[in-house]
């Protein structure tokens, strides 16, 4: 009977190891797919820059050429990173764990009556699939954190809502810069794997990876969430882990009509800040920082700062939980004038 239990334990251990490996494989694929999407986006941006350079090369007027060159020089750096995915290297570690465990099991069987209970204990192995990026040397030295709105605006990144991810109750307007919850009115969006099925959420079309980014949004109505998530979020799930407040790879800020609340891994942190109808969102990918600021014309107030561990490209994420909620992405490139420099304050 004891040998029967031992055999069952071995089979259970085998099943658990296989399940563990499958989960890690899916996590690795999710990270790789996120990086692939980011590289494809960067490739398209580089092709666009190539076309702009070819157009400039054909300009014969020297003054016009210099004007176009200055505009091009001030555009965002779109360096193309190389990527190393270390899944193969990690397999040797898994093989070592299994080999050592087998030897240990044989030793236990020599005196199984005394060691059986010890063998039955579960052991956890810290086996990770790591995706690492090779970053250019000029990004190794960390720059000081911005302290004025003018400095934040140096990192402006233009984002739009991705119509292929928008829930059927969300209406996109203004060239995909405004989203509104129109429940119960549905919109005739095609059924796509990337579209959210249960939670009224939408992601940005652009990925954020390796650099610093800044954008601003205007929020309308209690129950709006603004944050970041990874490409691997389950768009079809109904569980809390499928919304941007309920998992450990999403970070979000909620406005409940009275105050802001920070959310991470289904845990909330009430904040004494607000009301602010415009939020500034700052991402320092290398530094692992996500900060939210209340923005007024002449001031910025820190609402909350997350310390994050980014391992793959992230996307701006938005959850409009109630009817008539709306979020608008501010086009900072069309603001009438830049505000005077003002130091960033902290909410009391």
Swiss-Prot record:
Keyword line: Cytoplasm
One GO term describing the cellular component: cytoplasm
Coiled-coil region(s): none
Residue ranges annotated for the B30.2/SPRY domain, each copy included: 139-337
Main location group: cytoplasm
Protein's UniProt name: Tripartite motif-containing protein 16-like protein
SMART domains assigned to the protein according to its UniProt record, in alphabetical order: PRY, SPRY
InterPro entries documented for this protein: B30.2/SPRY, B30.2/SPRY_sf, Butyrophylin_SPRY, ConA-like_dom_sf, PRY, SCF_subunit_WD-repeat, SPRY_dom
Family: Belongs to the TRIM/RBCC family.
Keyword Cytoplasm: yes
UniProt superkingdom: Eukaryota
Lineage start: Eukaryota, Metazoa, Chordata, Craniata, Vertebrata
Subcellular location(s) per record: Cytoplasm
Gene: TRIM16L
CDD domains reported for this sequence: SPRY_PRY_TRIM16
